């Protein structure tokens, strides 16, 4: 700046002062206050009100849902279920527009291929974990018995530590120890636990020391495509329907077709559909 005294010229620097000062101190062994000699007129970016961040996120998600032709019924269900966990947990993660854009960009890639097979509430929460807590995201996939009701599916139950039919108290003690262990080094560990409780009632049972079995039945979780149901769980991570499964989208469309069909044709069409699925070894 001093050796280039050009007229009508302004030198504009965009930088993170904390990062620069830390670099001076650790790498150059220079006092962090040396930055003041270089930049005489710092102008920090003004902070943005949280309500504008919330609105920006809401608008971007709504735009994505419109592009994906998400039904009005599903959006209304989300608007009923999502605000509580957003206000108490999620909005604390989104303090900058950069974080919102990163999250929505990820969501724009992961949701489209599986949009009809997942619960929107659960998928939006899981996407936060995938973006900001990748270690936890990988642990959910690698250790599903610490999150799911493993007894609902023998494929998850037999490899689990609970195959010896432990008492619930002992089982939840193991789950709590596991969750505490993997979250302890995370920056926002308590907020993260709040998200996990919002997704997996077994985690809530373990951390809060109460049981929600009556609230979350196997039938309800399957109908609502909740991540905590073993038949839905894989879809959230594979972003596709397993080759051995019939997609929910196909089942729903087929049932709607049968419902609208004339009674005289219904039996033949149903038989034909079942035969085709059997030929593909899916049914």
Language model: regions and residue ranges:
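The feature marks long, low-complexity, polar/acidic/proline-rich intrinsically disordered regions embedded
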Residues: 5-9, 21, 47-283
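A short helix-turn-beta junction within AAA+ P-loop NTPase domains corresponding to the substrate/partner-engaging
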Residues: 27-46
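Conserved P-loop NTPase "ATPase switch" module shared by AAA+ and STAND
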Residues: 1
């Amino acid at each position: 700046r001093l050796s280039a005294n050009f007229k009508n010229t302004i030198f504009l620097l965009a930088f993170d002062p904390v990062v620069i000062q830390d670099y001076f101190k650790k790498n150059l062994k220079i006092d962090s206050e040396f930055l003041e000699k270089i930049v005489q007129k710092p102008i920090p970016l003004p902070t943005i009100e949280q309500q504008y961040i919330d609105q920006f996120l809401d608008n971007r998600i709504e735009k994505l849902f419109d592009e994906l032709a998400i039904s009005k019924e599903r959006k209304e269900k989300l608007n009923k279920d999502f605000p509580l966990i957003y206000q108490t947990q999620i909005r604390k993660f989104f303090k900058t527009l950069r974080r919102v854009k990163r999250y929505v960009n990820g969501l724009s890639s992961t949701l489209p291929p599986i949009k009809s097979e997942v619960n929107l509430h659960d998928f939006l929460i899981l996407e936060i974990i995938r973006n900001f807590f990748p270690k936890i995201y990988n642990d959910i996939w690698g250790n599903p018995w610490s999150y799911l009701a493993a007894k609902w599916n023998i494929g998850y139950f037999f490899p689990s530590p609970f195959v010896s039919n432990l008492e619930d108290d002992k089982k939840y003690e193991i789950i709590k120890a596991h969750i505490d262990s993997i979250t302890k080094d995370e920056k926002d560990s308590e907020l993260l636990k709040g998200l996990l409780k919002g997704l997996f009632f077994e985690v809530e049972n373990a951390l809060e020391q109460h049981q929600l079995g009556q609230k979350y039945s196997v039938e309800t979780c399957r109908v609502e495509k909740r991540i905590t149901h073993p038949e839905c769980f894989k879809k959230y991570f594979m972003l596709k329907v397993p080759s051995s499964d019939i997609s929910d989208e196909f089942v729903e469309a087929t049932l709607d077709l049968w419902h609208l069909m004339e009674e005289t044709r219904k039996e033949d069409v149903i038989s034909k559909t079942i035969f085709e699925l059997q030929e593909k070894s899916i049914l």
